[in-house]
Amino acid sequence: LTAKYPNFAAQTVDADAPLSIELIGAIDKVQQVAGVPTSVPIAMTTYAEAKDLLRELVTRNLAQNMSIRYAGWMNGGMNQQLLSSVRLIRQLGTQEELFSFAQNAAIAGVPLYLDGLTAFARDSGLLEGFIAFRDAARFTTREEAEIPEYSPIWYGANDDRDTYYLVKPAIAMRSVNTLVDAAASYGAGVSFRDIGYM
């Protein structure tokens, strides 16, 4: 092959190639708290670790055409609760640390996108703000739009996982505005993980 096409195997460096990094802040894990199974956020990438990673990429000159998407940074982690307000995860750090990370990204010229779910919600109960009977969108048959988790391996409904709900459009728009306002307060952009996903 190389005899017929001598330039085929030549290595080229494309400095303009985009690099997109997704960081996961916290995941949810059910643990026993005082004998009661409770969903607890487990830190994967804290705000300070994200800032250190950004600093290292910048010092190694790898931050050109780079963007960062930070998922699981608030409201319980990756399986986020309804986005009626933004509550940072204390296991990830303080508000000042998140602001410092966002500020360092802006100084380095690296777009930072704070990720959130706005069109879907998990049945979280009265205290978290989502009640399926009241807040879930409905099919034409008046059934709640309850959606099962799908396996990325065999593309079928995964009965071992909890279901989630499509929320009413008014609630989805409120969630969008909440996420946009929160991201703007840190000087970051937004990433809508679920808009357009079905």
Regions picked out by a protein language model, each given a short descriptive name:
Residues L1-L19:
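Core subunits and conserved enzymes of cellular information-processing
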